[in-house]
A protein has these predicted regions:
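Extended, solvent-exposed, non-transmembrane regions
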Residues: 2-328
Length: 328
């Protein structure tokens, strides 16, 4: 077995920094329950999986019709992993590091002639810096809805692309960052205050707010709330949804209820920490201390459909996910 190189002071091994890229993108996937039962396999799925190599993978899908119920004219996906060794912006900020980009685009989308959109883009990019590079800077710039309509009525959607904020200080995970947790809590409280909120949603929002309070106490060092496994937090890029003048249509946060159709949740985001992808390397090889290596991940789905009557089933997309791990 190869030995680690020794530092000049002889204090221990000097480990060369490296990065494992991981990203995924999918145009659309789901299932139908009635009037027929059918699995909708992921269209255009591409995966940049557990590799240290700089990589670009793309895929395009042409016109697609799923039993005359769900259709789209075209779509494409893209995942990129690359290292930028020397880069500063016009303000002199250093952006050297490892960058991962994941993109999914859906065009000419139609769900039983009720949900339509000319173009929907899901995009996430993470930048792991060379110094304190275990937690990345993240951006969702490029994500958007173009000419999104319900029953032919335009739906005005305002996105909060900065929901995650700046990279947390001290290389802390996002779900242990007080500023991020405060923003998500305010988002949930605003949705929970909606007039006429159904009891089922009220309970869900209350549970999510209580969970955030637990995350805050754990981040502040409460020994009773030490990490048990890996954690995650759901929120949304939606800042606001404009009025939809259709009888019976209601909005609750990022969720839209449509009578005789079901619900559609917009720009659903999951932020979490999980085991760093090791590409076959053990923790002992990468970190002599044996300390587990965590990886921050970000998963975004622009549409999450729950169909009721007369069509039953569900589906999501376009969707992207990005993470990766820097070692040691």
């Amino acid at each position: 077995m190869a030995a680690y190189p020794k530092s000049p002071m002889g204090s221990g091994p000097v480990l060369e920094e490296s990065h494992i890229y991981h990203a995924e993108a999918t145009i659309f996937s789901g299932h139908l329950e009635h009037p027929i039962k059918q699995t909708i396999e992921p269209y255009g799925r591409v995966v940049l999986e557990n590799t240290r190599r700089e990589t670009l993978i793309t895929q395009s899908v042409g016109e697609t019709d799923i039993e005359g119920l769900i259709s789209f004219k075209r779509g494409h996906t893209r995942v990129v992993g690359t290292q930028v060794k020397h880069k500063t912006d016009i303000f002199g900020n250093d952006h050297a590091g490892w960058v991962t980009l994941s993109t999914a685009v859906l065009e000419g989308f139609n769900v039983v002639d009720i949900i339509t959109a000319d173009r929907v883009v899901a995009q996430v990019s993470t930048e792991h810096p060379m110094v304190e590079g275990h937690v990345p800077t993240v951006t969702f710039l490029g994500s958007r809805f173009e000419n999104f309509r319900i029953g032919g009525v335009p739906v005005e959607v305002e996105l909060d692309l900065g929901i995650c904020g700046s990279k947390p200080k001290g290389d802390r995970p996002y779900i242990e960052d007080a500023d991020f947790l405060d923003r998500v809590e305010r988002q949930l409280e605003h949705a929970a205050d909606t007039k006429g909120l159904p009891e089922t949603l009220e309970k869900q929002y209350d549970a999510k707010i209580a969970y955030i309070d637990d995350l805050k106490r754990r981040a502040n060092g409460d020994p009773k709330l030490a990490r048990n496994g890996y954690s995650k937090l759901q929120c949304s890029l939606i800042k606001s949804i404009g009025p939809i003048p259709i009888p019976g249509v209601r909005t609750f946060g990022n969720l839209i209820f449509i009578p005789n159709f079901g619900t559609v949740a917009l720009a659903e985001l999951e932020v979490g920490i999980g085991p760093s992808h090791g590409n076959g390397f053990s923790h002992e090889q990468d970190d002599p201390s044996g300390k587990p290596s965590d990886s921050n991940y970000f998963t975004l789905n622009m549409f999450d459909l729950k169909l009721g009557c007369p069509v039953g089933g569900g589906g999501s997309g376009p969707g992207v996910s990005g993470n990766g791990g820097t070692r040691p």
